[in-house]
């Protein structure tokens, strides 16, 4: 199983394109773990609009980018973990 761990904070500008670029490369048995650091824009709504069972989101209060990545990693279940910043668009073949 692959876990892609993403840290977000007010990432509404790129989040949809980014999630699409990741989901197109992972299997149904893989996961996208998103840790949101207290976004106050539409990031959460855009993530939830996917209705994809591979996506798990953890939304909390603002801490720091490091804490945010650690939070995503601690919730990951995969044997292999990829990290993704909130504005990364994954080109084909990354996974």
Model-assigned labels for residue ranges:
Residues 1-3, 31:
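Cell-envelope/extracellular polymer assembly enzymes that use nucleotide-activated donors
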Residues 11-24:
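Short, well-formed alpha-helical segments that are part of the catalytic scaffolds
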Residues 36-45:
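A conserved acidic beta->alpha catalytic loop
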Residues 37, 84-86:
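Active-site acidic Asp-centered loop
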Residues 42, 88-95:
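Acidic donor-binding/catalytic loop of UDP-sugar-dependent glycosyltransferases
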Residues 60-76:
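Glycine-rich, basic loop-to-helix element that forms the pyrophosphate-binding segment
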Residues 81:
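Short aromatic/hydrophobic "clamp" motif used to bind/position activated sugar donors
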